[in-house]
Amino acid sequence: MSAYGMPMYKSGDLVFAKLKGYAHWPARIEHMTQPNRYQVFFFGTHETAFLSPKRLFPYKECKEKFGKPNKRRGFSAGLWEIENNPTVQASDCPLASEKGSGDGPWPEPEAAEGDEDKPTHAGGGGDELGKPDDDKPTEEEKGPLKRSAGDPPEDAPKRPKEAAPDQEEEAEAERAAEAERAAAAAAATAVDEESPFLVAVENGSAPSEPGLVCEPPQPEEEELREEEVADEEASQEWHAEAPGGGDRDSL
């Protein structure tokens, strides 16, 4: 015991160390840095802090009280190390192996009373207890997160090309052209079928199919009609001369 009634510790002693905002943590005394101030090594997180004796509790006497399971990251690993590997160093078990543990995240600690009570990483870092450096995103990782809201995500589906309507119009134009060509071919076929009849009529010959075109009058019929007309005219002249003609004088 010290002159102040506080227990005295030596290097290698196992204790529970209490930081404000954290549970009583399994730790090991490294050495005394100044009167009533100890540097302690935290099991599970491999960080260090400078604490006064009033924040340190003997491990064996307080094991049942403070050694209950805790969901904070690194606590279960710390209990295992203090029992099975109490001489572990920071380089023996990298802190990165703790990232995959299922102990859950650490809650934010309360403000410490002094700078000397803040835990520091055994490798020289100044992070909080139970929060490894790897959990903090770097500036390079934060860079992509600063993308403006107007920029579309890279995985977003691309908009359909504007050339699609043009292709549809071209297809419609091709279909219309094909329809026009088919209509022209049908019309040409119809003209070819009617042309023999027209040629036959123009040449004065009878068409190959009767009944489709009126036959022109035959020359013999015209001559007969002309003869009939001439006979009628001659008969009329004879009857006109008969009543008062020169035949009476001859009689």
Curated annotation (Swiss-Prot):
Residues of the region (Disordered) are: 89-251
**Cited Gene3D superfamilies:** 2.30.30.140
Q: Name one GO biological process term.
A: chromatin remodeling
Which residue intervals define the domain PWWP in the entry?
A: 11-62
Example of a GO cellular component annotation carried by this entry: nucleus
* InterPro entries for this protein: PWWP_dom
Biased composition, class Acidic residues, residue ranges: 218-235
| Segments of skewed composition (Basic and acidic residues) | 128-144, 155-164, 236-251
The domain of life is: Eukaryota
PROSITE patterns, per database record: PWWP
Family, as annotated: Belongs to the HDGF family.
Q: What is this protein called?
A: Hepatoma-derived growth factor-like protein 1
Give the gene that encodes this protein.
HDGFL1
